[in-house]
Amino acid sequence: MTCTDQKSHSQRALGTQTPALQGPQLLNTDPSSEETRPPHVYPDRLCHMEPANHFWHAGDLQAMTSKEFHLAATQDDCRKGRTQEDILVPSSHPELFSSVLPMALEEAARLQQPQPLPPPSGIHLSASRTSAPTLLYSPPPSHSPFGLSSLI
């Protein structure tokens, strides 16, 4: 009798478990729960995607500036009479690379930060408005007659 009692007890346990298992499945297939979930999921994904895209663009810009600087640095080395072998082999001239790397970091920092430091190399009216107008307005009257006479 104990065997049949155990079987009936286990069947009763299974019988009580099957409705419990079907309960959450019915809740998961409830259309109201599905309608409330997607609006919460998609904006979160978009919000997380946008900063990642901005970081990638910033990385691309940094890569471009560093490539441009390295090209300029190798051209400067070639102008000084150094061969490409000296540039490509760091072990032969370690002091050369120790002097070039800090300059590369400083140059990269200058390229990434638009500050009033670059204007001496080029004319930027928006960068320094206090000293630039006086310098730009005084030379043209003196230079304009020479420019016109040279054209005529």
Swiss-Prot record:
Biological source species: Pan troglodytes
InterPro entries, alphabetized: SEEK1 (IPR028206)
Protein name (Swiss-Prot/TrEMBL): Psoriasis susceptibility 1 candidate gene 1 protein homolog
Ranges of Polar residues composition bias in the record: 1-31
Transmembrane segments: none
One Pfam family from the record: SEEK1
Region span, Disordered: 1-39, 132-152
Domain of life: Eukaryota
Leader sequence segment: none
